[in-house]
Amino acid sequence: MKTLLLTLVVVTIVCLDLGYTLKCNKLPPIASKTCPAGKNLCYKMFMMSDLTIPVKRGCIDVCPKNSLLVKYVCCNTDRCN
């Protein structure tokens, strides 16, 4: 009986995914990855010379400021980048 109860607890923890995990796209190639603890934003990085094609995607803790050469777009939902 204890084994059954322990099994149910383990299955519940695995299914509920205790501790929300954010999933962000990464580049290259486009695929998603689970962000580590503390990195709760997804980002896209563009070169200012071509704002149509992102050059980098991933997880980040703080959205960087844009510069003369690089623009960042950050968001906080799964695969939003």
UniProtKB/Swiss-Prot annotation:
Location within or outside the cell: Secreted; Target cell membrane
Q: Which domain of life is it from?
A: Eukaryota
Cited function: Shows cytolytic activity on many different cells by forming pore in lipid membranes. In vivo, increases heart rate or kills the animal by cardiac arrest. In addition, it binds to heparin with high affinity, interacts with Kv channel-interacting protein 1 (KCNIP1) in a calcium-independent manner, and binds to integrin alpha-V/beta-3 (ITGAV/ITGB3) with moderate affinity.
**Which parts of the chain are coiled coil?**
none
InterPro entries under this entry?
Answer: Cytotoxin_Cobra, Snake_3FTx, Snake_toxin-like_sf, Snake_toxin_con_site, Toxin_cobra-type
Choose one Gene Ontology CC annotation of this protein and give it. extracellular region
Q: Does the keyword section mention Secreted?
A: yes
Molecular function GO labels: toxin activity
Q: Which residues form the signal peptide?
A: 1-21
> Is this entry keyworded Protease?
no
UniProt entry keywords in alphabetical sequence: Cardiotoxin, Cytolysis, Disulfide bond, Membrane, Secreted, Signal, Target cell membrane, Target membrane, Toxin
Organism per entry? Naja atra (Chinese cobra)
What biological processes does GO assign it? killing of cells of another organism
What is the tissue specificity? Answer: Expressed by the venom gland.
Q: How does this protein assemble? A: Monomer in solution; Homodimer and oligomer in the presence of negatively charged lipids forming a pore with a size ranging between 20 and 30 Angstroms.
Q: Which CDD domains match?
A: TFP_snake_toxin
- Main localization, broad class: secreted
Name recorded for this polypeptide: Cytotoxin 1a
Q: Which cysteine pairs are joined by S-S bonds?
A: 24-42, 35-59, 63-74, 75-80
In which family does this protein belong, per the annotation?
Belongs to the three-finger toxin family. Short-chain subfamily. Type IA cytotoxin sub-subfamily.
